Amino acid sequence: MEVLMAERANLVFHNKAIDGTAIKRLISRLIDHFGMAYTSHILDQVKTLGFQQATATSISLGIDDLLTIPSKGWLVQDAEQQSLILEKHYHYGNVHAVEKLRQSIEIWYATSEYLRQEMNLNFRMTEPFNPVHIMSFSGARGNTSQVHQLVGMRGLMSDPQGQMIDLPIQSNLREGLSLTEYIISCYGARKGVVDTAVRTSDAGYLTRRLVEVVQHIVVRRTDCGTARGISVSPRNGMMPERIFIQTFIGRVLADNIYMGLRCIAIRNQDIGIGLANRFITFRTQTISIRTPFTCRSTSWICRLCYGRSPTHGDLVELGEAVGIIAGQSIGEPGTQLTLRTFHTGGVFTGGTAEHVRAPSNGKIKFNEDLVHPIRTRHGHPAFLCYIDLYVTIKSQDIIHNVTIPPKSFLLVQNDQYVESEQVIAEIRAGAYTLNFKEKVRKHIYSDSEGEMHWSTDVYHAPEFTYSNVHLLPKTSHLWILSGSSCRSSIVPFSLHKDQDQMNVHSLSVKRRYISSPSVNNDQVKHKFFSSDFSGKKESGIPDYSELNRSICTGHCNLIYSTILYKNSDLLAKRRRNKFIIPFQSIQEREKELMTQSAISIEIPINGIFRRNSVFAYFDDPQYRKKSSGITKYGAIGVHSIVKKEDLIEYRGVKEFKPKYQTKVDRFFFIPEEVYILPESSSLMVRNNSIIGVDTQIALNTRSRVGGLVRVERKKKKMELKIFSGDIHFPGETDKISRHSDILIPPGTVKTNSKESKKVKNWIYIQRITPTKKKYFVLVRPVIIYEIANGINLETLFPQDLLQEKDNLKLRVVNYILYGTGKPIRGISDTSIQLVRTCLVLNWDQDKKSSSIEEARAAFVEISTNGLIRDFLRINLVKFHISYIGRKRNDPSGSEPISNNGSDRTNINPFYPIYSKTRVQQSLKQNQGTISTLLNINKECQSLIILSSSNCFQMDPFNDVKHHNVIKESIKRDPIIPIRNSLGPLGTALQIANFYLFYHLNLITHNQISVTKYSKLYNLKQTFQVLKYYLMDENGRIVNPDPCSNSVLNPFNLNWYFLHHNYCESFFTIISLGQFICENLCMAKNGPHLKSGQVIIVHIDSVVIRSAKPYLATPGATVHGHYGEILYEGNTLVTFIYEKSRSGDITQGLPKVEQVLEVRSIDSISINLEKRVEGWNECITRILGIPWGFLIGTELTIVQSRISLVNKIQKVYRSQGVQIHNRHIEIIVRQITSKVLVSEDGMSNVFSPGELIGLLRAERTGRALEEAICYGAILLGITRASLNTQSFISEASFQETTRVLAKAALRGRIDWLKGLKENVVLGGMIPVGTGFKGLVQGSRQHKNIPLKTKKKNLFEGEFRDRDILFHHRELFDSCISKNLYDTSEQSFIGFNDS
């Protein structure tokens, strides 16, 4: 007792707080001194003491203890101000979305961090014993980050994927959150709850895979005799002492350690805490230690390479299953990685760059030759310096020198005046932050619809040569030129051409769907469209453009053209007087069937149409039937329209059928099957018998439907009809059945003696009397056809915008081609057309134009740009016009000169249609200019309507001197109605001449006129340039491919024109097609407000089509073609950028898994690949080819192993989980132990592409005395599990059938060396006690001598087995330069004795 007391008296009294590390050290020293039992007793006392003190202190937390920080208000305000400026820059197109996101994250992150520092200071000054303050630094639960959320601001949140939400939460939990902030907060909170569940299962699966990889690794030998080691230096200070000691303790030395001449530790000695501390104190040379990496065995490990057992502190026992222990040691904390998510609750943590600030006010000077301009990652202009840059700041008499380190950004210009503490440079964060970075793709979507346009050359990525993915070689803007578009695939042709002024009413349509009445096809069919003309007589306002369902075509040419679809086999057929246009229905287009229907235009041979003559017809496929039957249209009167003039008109047209015009809305079709058989054929069914489907009727005929059979014998043939339907035997009281051949509408009650029921559909009742006088009634189904009024052929012929006289009208009439009650026969498989839709020509007969009696029509063929188009021209003819002046070859002469005197030539651009278009519909109720755009995507082109809301006119040639009253009023209200001004797009009067003029000179004159405008020479007002193109800033003109239409709409009243004199105030030279950014100063009167493209240059004003710029930096991928039409929400650009991952827990487990499964290269920094390439070149240059392979592979493997261990350790350490390196090393050794055979020099042993173990490859090379070419490969843990020596182990992991089948085919042998194979087969597992028997069996094979004939390939040059270590200098230099991310380096170099 006295001895103990005396010892106590000698003990030193430590007065300092004990944290977790100190407790650990204390416990280990206690165990060393007193042993286990006594230590546990002491620890119990310590625990009791702790609980007593905590009870006595009784820290409680009240809401009053949460003190908010006074400076928060202005800090947040400042950050908001910065964000606002940033938003403006983005809007102007100065920064792109990624730069904006990055900067806004950094602004808020910095604010939040600053608040956090303020919080600590604030507490220390105001209330150092505040319980919140005490708790946050106690190290128990809660940390500054959480307290900061309570009293500072929550800041930026991560979403479930670890990405940033760029809307910060400005409130803290004490103040309370707004609704938006609450919802964003829920992301982080949700992660804590959900992850706990989900990630636990993930961690379990990770453990399973890890154990699978290493289950066969058992300690089987004491020493493998390796001479290699991994060298660790305690001197370089890169590693914290704690981690250094943790790396060392329990390892075995691979070499003697000398201190001067004195040996302080010998090879194969294990390192305890005393020795480790001695190494640190002496700062000895690099220490070479043995690790599982250096063990020479392939499928097991030796005691010395493994080191001490973690359980009892001695060298590991033979037969210990260290593989399984390693797998569980790494997998098990995975659950901890997950369960700790609630630490920061999803709050984002990242890093910001360091800044260099100016020491005082003054002018800054530096050498401009040493810097070159660059964009920072926030999109700001800056200078990058490659070497140390010396900057002088000169105030009145003091000169300050500042050195800026290399690779920094200089944020000021030369000779600029800087203020004290202004940020002048930004130091790039060092290489160690790379570990938290990853490559991310960010898609930018367009905010508005319009055409895409870019202002620089773009390249095709090699793998996307034929698609619409382009890579940008330099920074440039992408513009979306606005225009609202209409997308429709309903009607496949239109009659408008580029630049036409058109009345959009002619395209205004509604979609209507009518369900298909046919039984077998219940798809919804589109009715093409019913016109949306509303000007009926009831409205009382006669509007010529909305005449009731008629289309005025006046004197202008009505032009038709060939239509080409995406399937080019649908060509219009042209005969002498007939023109057939193929036409695809929706279903056909979806199924890509050949078209079945067409629109035919027939012209009388003499080319003259009279009034009411049929001009075109269309056979609608929905009125087409395969089966025979009878049409009925009720008792409503029917009259024929076949009159005399029609007979004259059809002179020479061969097929002429009577056509019946129905006044009814619907008609009925009663189907029946008809078979016409030769008289001699023998029937297999009786008359009036009832048969089922597919019954044999005659020799080669089977019935297609079931029903009642009626046979009629006629001259030389027999007619056999099958009526489907129900047979009904009427009672005496049944009155309905007395009638025959009647139609009964739905809802009529059909009575019977036994049952009475309502009829659901229309039925047809037919009375049938067989020979035995007993009659019965056949109830037959009826198909109803609703004839929709006016199928939309009329919408193909747009109304004329300008001509009001001599209106030519087209009436749509539906004819039923068969009379009521007449049987219709279908011959074999041809289908029967029941209804034909015709267009009947008509024109007004008012007083003025009473003389018009006929219209001339002709087909005209015009070849433009190598495309041949067929046009149809119709002109109304007055009798007093003579035809004498026609020239044969003159294209303009083939048409009579009409009354208004302007001779329109055939090249007149009114309503022609380019080939390859589809009919689009526009839903805008206004007029516009149509424009054809490039659109490679032929499937669904679109109309673009460029309405006045998308354009604005501004006047750059403003002079302050010329202000007058009107100018002032314009300033107050900039919208002047278009009617008061003859602006470039308001010139409806000049349109006739103008069209002719521009269309003949497509592009040539415009360039000249534009340059003249831009220099403002005296050109006349009438010289309008309305040709619309996509022109880029380099002055190239793109002539758009005529693949889609767009409508530029100039006639609304909200364009504004500012008219006054131009003078010398004109600064910017404006050229056509130029793009103008927002707030660009074009004239003295200040910046102009919107961004856009100049489409019209006037003498005193310009018209700008509004456009939105998007900035794109080099390496970005552009989706879409130049001039393609994009809709809102389409992907525009994809940026690939490096971004910091949030350091939150959620990243822990996936990160470990990503490293172990060797997933994508995203997480590898961009510089690393370059470093590896450089290293390879350097090696092969020094050593030559064969050595290069060997050493390259060897080093790559060593290097990747060290790097993987560091990465995994980093994740675990960041979570406070401590795992001994050797566990990770065992796993990593397994996933890096294979190489890939690269060339077939060894074809007699290994095939190229085969995976073999590294050691096996080396041994085979030595034995065969040949060099094997192989490269290192990293297998993920899953692949490594499926590439083992044992197929039983593989099959029990996953893909069982595949593994077993392959093993059977290859005749694989399983030597049952691992644990799992033996467990599966019920044998004794070769670990622990079962290990002894295994060893005894293998001893006898040990001493067989191996004889080699020749000297080894390697021995000639280097005697030692491991040649690479003779290149020690090369090795160290390369490694130190190239291969290391020196963050927390556990190992440096690579050593051999």
UniProtKB/Swiss-Prot annotation:
Subunit structure: In plastids the minimal PEP RNA polymerase catalytic core is composed of four subunits: alpha, beta, beta', and beta''. When a (nuclear-encoded) sigma factor is associated with the core the holoenzyme is formed, which can initiate transcription.
SUPFAM superfamilies per UniProt: beta and beta-prime subunits of DNA dependent RNA-polymerase
Reactions performed catalytically: RNA(n) + a ribonucleoside 5'-triphosphate = RNA(n+1) + diphosphate
Source organism of this protein record: Manihot esculenta
GO molecular function: DNA binding; DNA-directed RNA polymerase activity; zinc ion binding
InterPro entries assigned: DNA-dir_RpoC2_beta_pp (IPR012756), RNA_pol_beta''_euk (IPR050254), RNA_pol_Rpb1_3_sf (IPR042102), RNA_pol_Rpb1_4 (IPR007083), RNA_pol_Rpb1_5 (IPR007081), Rpb1_funnel_sf (IPR038120)
Required co-factors: Zn(2+)
Family listed: Belongs to the RNA polymerase beta' chain family. RpoC2 subfamily.
Highest taxon in the source lineage: Eukaryota
Cofactor binding summary note: Binds 1 Zn(2+) ion per subunit.
Keywords attached to this entry: Chloroplast, DNA-directed RNA polymerase, Metal-binding, Nucleotidyltransferase, Plastid, Transcription, Transferase, Zinc
Chain residues that bind Zn(2+): 224, 295, 302, 305
Any single GO BP term: DNA-templated transcription
Function comment: DNA-dependent RNA polymerase catalyzes the transcription of DNA into RNA using the four ribonucleoside triphosphates as substrates.
Protein's recorded name: DNA-directed RNA polymerase subunit beta''
